[in-house]
Amino acid sequence: MGGFFGTVSQQPCVADLFYGTDYQSHLGTRRGGMASFSSESGFYRSIHNLENTYFRTRFESELDRFVGNSGIGVISDTDAQPMLINCHLGRFAVVTV
């Protein structure tokens, strides 16, 4: 099982993304990831193993690297996510649950 959380805002949304994804932690224990998007700097993505620690502990130290007004986070028991996809429509961060 797994869970995901996404947000789009007119203001910076990294804190909402972090806490919203952390709230899904009870749905999986293997991998966690977040991706944020800023029109100035593009995508920033990070994926961590959660088998021996908590989501919050893994991501808190690099939270200042995430910038943007939109983002997606995932807790997964199967795959390392979010995936960055390039296609003729543009670049996307995608998760599957």
PLM features: residue spans?
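N-terminal glutamine amidotransferase
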Residues: 1-97
